[in-house]
Amino acid sequence: MKIVFSCLLCVTLIACNSKANDKALTSRMDSLEQKLSRSYKPGLGEFMFNIQVHHAKLWFAGQNQNWKLADFEIHEIMEAIDAIQQFNTDRPEIKSLRMINVPLDSVNAAIQQKSVASFKSSFTLLTNTCNNCHQATEHGFNQIKIPDSPPVSNQTFTVQ
């Protein structure tokens, strides 16, 4: 009988301790969820601004046949697209984002081939696709174009 009582007492203590641990874990999870909901999450506009700068830098890198810089810039754009899909899942525009994949791949291929002609045509396709996406997502007022001047004055785009 003492053995049965001891076993029941152990089971009861473990069960009570488990409930206390569950409450502590639930409380901790709630606290972390609140902190997470208040943490910084970049907006779609921030990503798009970033992409726009890299788009312009990509153009000048390609025009100057600075293929290493062009490769860097196209991958910065690709990373930003990936980040949009990770951090802006609540935005309906995300459904249209995949239309950019083929033009990005085309620009990337032109860079790997080091072909100025292919770069120009694929960059034009990329730019037009940006505008098509803007139209499809009711942001047609935001028209992107092939840049006239570099987006920054403190960077050279020629091969050094």
Segments predicted by a language model, with ranges:
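Immediate post-signal-peptide N-terminus of mature secreted/exported proteins
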Residues: 20-67, 159
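Sec-dependent signal peptide recognition
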Residues: 1-7
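Short cysteine/histidine-rich metal-coordination sites, predominantly Zn2+-binding motifs
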Residues: 144-154
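Amphipathic, charged alpha-helical scaffolds that flank and support histidine-based chemistry
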Residues: 67, 93-96, 100, 104-126
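The canonical Cys-X-X-Cys-His
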Residues: 126-138
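Short, solvent-exposed, charged loop/turn and helix-capping segments
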Residues: 80-97
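C-terminal motif of bacterial Sec signal peptides marking the signal peptidase cleavage site
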Residues: 14-15
